[in-house]
């Protein structure tokens, strides 16, 4: 405690014997021993109180961390997790039900061509050189966005799929007329 070796204790004992004397030396040593006992007792009490305060502080920290863990696990209880999972499943089922309740989608295939549309397509192709897409008026009105015309629609506008009488219309031949009225027109 004081870091005193044997040689230093012998020096202190010799000085005490010379200074105090041999008669009073045992009484002085007894008194020094009592003071040392009191000092040790005070030191042990202080040490005990200090350790008790440290334990209380550790217990308070442990209790605080335990309460934090308890609060965190309160939100993760299995009943709460099952309730949350059940609500998510019911939401998913409601989404699927709304998809099933919606009206069926009408097909987007064009209506079958009529002879008028073939004549119109043939005329358009002859004038512009591009095939005309044949669609019904209801489909044209229902289209909200401009989409590229699929190749199948172009195929309907070709003359290969047209009825035989409209695919190759007969050439327009002038009807035979009498040459007499034409001659009369030249003469006048």
Curated annotation (Swiss-Prot):
InterPro entries reported in the protein's UniProt record: TatB (IPR018448)
TM region positions: 1-21
An annotated GO cellular component: TAT protein transport complex
Chief location category: membrane
Keyword Metal-binding applies: no
Protein's GO biological process: protein transport by the Tat complex
GO terms assigned for molecular function: protein transmembrane transporter activity
Annotated segments matching region Disordered: 147-188
Low complexity: compositionally biased ranges: 160-170
Keyword annotations of the record: Cell inner membrane, Cell membrane, Membrane, Protein transport, Translocation, Transmembrane, Transmembrane helix, Transport
Positions in coiled-coil regions: none
Membrane topology term: Single-pass membrane protein
Domain of life: Bacteria
Location in or out of the cell: Cell inner membrane
NCBIfam families in the cross-refs: tatB (TIGR01410)
The protein's role, per its UniProt record: Part of the twin-arginine translocation (Tat) system that transports large folded proteins containing a characteristic twin-arginine motif in their signal peptide across membranes. Together with TatC, TatB is part of a receptor directly interacting with Tat signal peptides. TatB may form an oligomeric binding site that transiently accommodates folded Tat precursor proteins before their translocation.
Subunit structure: The Tat system comprises two distinct complexes: a TatABC complex, containing multiple copies of TatA, TatB and TatC subunits, and a separate TatA complex, containing only TatA subunits. Substrates initially bind to the TatABC complex, which probably triggers association of the separate TatA complex to form the active translocon.
Protein family per UniProt: Belongs to the TatB family.
Protein name: Sec-independent protein translocase protein TatB
Species in which this protein is naturally found: Rhodopseudomonas palustris (strain HaA2)
């Amino acid at each position: 405690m004081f870091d005193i070796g044997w040689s230093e204790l012998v020096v202190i004992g010799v000085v005490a014997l010379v200074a105090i004397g041999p008669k009073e030396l045992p009484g002085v040593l007894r008194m020094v021993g009592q003071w040392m006992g009191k000092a040790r007792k005070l030191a042990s009490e202080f040490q005990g109180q200090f350790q008790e305060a440290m334990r209380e502080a550790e217990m308070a920290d442990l209790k605080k961390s335990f309460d934090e863990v308890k609060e965190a696990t309160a939100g993760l209880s299995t009943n709460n997790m099952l309730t949350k999972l059940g609500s998510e499943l019911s939401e998913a089922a409601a989404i699927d039900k709304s998809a099933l309740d919606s009206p069926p989608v009408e097909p987007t295939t064009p209506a079958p061509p009529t002879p008028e549309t073939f004549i119109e397509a043939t005329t358009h192709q002859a004038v512009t050189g591009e095939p005309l897409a044949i669609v019904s008026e209801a489909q044209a009105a229902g289209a909200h966005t401009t989409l590229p015309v699929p190749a199948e629609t172009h195929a309907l506008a070709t003359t290969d799929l047209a009825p035989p009488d409209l695919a190759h219309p007969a050439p327009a031949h002038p009807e035979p007329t009498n040459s007499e009225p034409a001659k009369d027109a030249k003469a006048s």
